[in-house]
């Protein structure tokens, strides 16, 4: 973190490094105030043991416990405990369920793939209240293993019972890395996406479930995910947070502006923008095939980008958003380009705020949930990495550089963001941590 004396117009000359140091203290529930998704793995009892880790054979009484030769699962850290506790609060689940774009797209995806779910065995990774597990049971699943480490699993079991589905939906309170399921599964479903797609690192548990239990040729929903980025102009945000200090009830408080910039723009901001804020076509940062991605690939993601500004405007930072696609085993994701949608139903944004959106024309088309600025709003919104000071860009001006997203070494659920960008002969670096 910079001291006030070193801060000059947001940059040291033309190459200013804006650093945010990792918190070296222990976690607290407030550390996960941004968390909007369910936990995916199992909570460690504060006394040191794993809480409520179940074997399916013990619960069903159908199979004898199987000994495994797998390597030991990763330890459950204090950060994990705090993360799991944050998902025991009903408010997080209420917000997710009330997100109609999210919940209705998942239900539609389940029904679209009903022929692959009916009579099959399903695992719901990070089941939360159990709503997706119940959707799968309603679609005719033979059995659904609903796995969650948070104490919300206790309520999920009651929800399942109240809906008369206890014979089909088995709630397992524990980490995916620790619980035992003594059979292979046909389908994995999970709403694992965090802000900026990879925040919270929940995808790792989906990969673990896939490698432990999914049959060859099985179905994973969603099947693919793509993270995008684009430069933006957002003068209203800057005016509201920074220019406000120029005149406060007739008092010159401009001395507050440098501190205000640090406080407002030091960390990534989760907020909603519109297509009118976007200066160029988006670029792909990372495309994920959930059937093939390896856990090691999530440690660090680096992408280079090159944008051509399509208008003259102040550039205030970069916006990030994602799409996820629900394709069946025989489907292929649509080709990724910076100027076309990733799949039918997703959208690409023009700098004028217009949207190229392809609707699904038949049931075999891939279903897409998009969090782009021009798609229906979701609780994910968009993630913005703001500059401390805007950069004026001209029409057709090139903006290029690279972005690296990496898991914090101390707490993998936090995400380090290293952003390099240059334009008109000036180069900059912005570093921050998404907590």
Curated annotation (Swiss-Prot):
Record-linked PROSITE patterns: SAM_MT_PRMT
InterPro entries: Arg_MeTrfase, PRMT_dom, SAM-dependent_MTases_sf
Enzyme Commission number(s): 2.1.1.-
Statement: the UniProt record of this protein carries the keyword Ion transport: no
Membrane-crossing segments per the record: none
Low complexity bias (residue ranges): 337-354
Active site (UniProt): 191, 200
Segments of skewed composition (Basic and acidic residues): 12-25
Chain intervals for the UniProt region annotation (Disordered): 1-48, 333-377
Molecular function terms from GO: protein-arginine N-methyltransferase activity
Keyword flag Transferase: yes
Enzyme class: transferase
UniProt: S-adenosyl-L-methionine binding residues: 93, 102, 126, 148, 177
Family: Belongs to the class I-like SAM-binding methyltransferase superfamily. Protein arginine N-methyltransferase family. PRMT6 subfamily.
Function: Arginine methyltransferase that can both catalyze the formation of omega-N monomethylarginine (MMA) and asymmetrical dimethylarginine (aDMA).
Official protein name in the record: Probable protein arginine N-methyltransferase 6
The organism of origin for this protein: Arabidopsis thaliana (Mouse-ear cress)
Classification lineage: Eukaryota, Viridiplantae, Streptophyta, Embryophyta, Tracheophyta
């Amino acid at each position: 973190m910079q001291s006030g004396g070193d801060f000059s117009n947001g940059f040291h000359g033309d190459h200013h490094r804006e650093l945010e140091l990792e918190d070296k203290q222990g976690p607290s529930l407030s550390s996960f105030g941004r968390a909007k998704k369910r936990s995916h793995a199992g909570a460690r009892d504060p006394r040191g043991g794993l809480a409520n880790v179940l074997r399916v054979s013990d619960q069903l009484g159908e199979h004898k416990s199987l000994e495994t030769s797998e390597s030991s699962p990763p330890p459950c850290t204090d950060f994990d405990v705090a993360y799991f506790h944050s998902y025991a609060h009903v408010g997080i689940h209420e917000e997710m369920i009330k997100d109609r774009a999210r919940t209705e797209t998942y239900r539609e995806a389940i029904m679209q793939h009903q022929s692959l779910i009916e009579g099959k065995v399903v695992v719901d990774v990070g089941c939360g209240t159990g709503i997706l597990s119940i959707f799968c049971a309603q679609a005719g699943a033979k059995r659904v293993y609903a796995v969650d480490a948070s104490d919300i699993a206790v309520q999920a079991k009651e929800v399942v019972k109240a809906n008369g589905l206890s014979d089909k939906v088995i709630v397992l309170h524990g980490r995916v890395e620790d619980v035992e399921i003594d059979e292979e599964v046909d389908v994995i479903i999970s709403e694992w996406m965090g802000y900026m797609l990879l925040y919270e690192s929940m995808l790792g548990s989906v990969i673990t479930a896939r490698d432990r239990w999914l049959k060859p040729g099985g179905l994973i929903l969603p099947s693919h995910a793509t993270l995008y980025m684009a430069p933006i102009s957002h003068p209203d945000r800057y005016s509201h947070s920074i220019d406000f200090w120029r005149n406060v009830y007739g008092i010159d408080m401009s001395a507050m502006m440098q501190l205000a910039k640090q406080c407002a723009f030091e960390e990534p901001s989760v907020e909603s923008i519109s297509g009118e804020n976007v200066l160029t076509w988006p670029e792909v940062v990372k495309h994920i095939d959930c059937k093939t991605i390896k856990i090691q690939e999530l440690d660090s993601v680096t992408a280079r980008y090159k944008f051509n500004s399509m208008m003259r405007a102040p550039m205030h930072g970069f916006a990030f958003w994602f799409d996820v696609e629900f394709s069946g085993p025989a489907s292929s994701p649509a080709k990724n380009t910076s100027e076309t949608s990733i799949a039918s139903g997703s959208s690409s944004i023009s700098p004028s705020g217009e949207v190229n959106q392809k609707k699904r024309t038949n049931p075999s088309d891939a279903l897409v949930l998009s969090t782009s600025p021009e798609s229906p709003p979701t609780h994910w919104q968009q993630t913005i990495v703001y500059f401390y000071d805007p950069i004026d860009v001209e029409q057709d001006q090139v903006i290029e550089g690279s972005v690296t997203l990496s898991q914090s070494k101390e707490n993998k659920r936090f995400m380090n963001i290293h952003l390099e960008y240059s334009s008109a002969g000036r180069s900059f670096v912005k570093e921050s941590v998404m907590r």
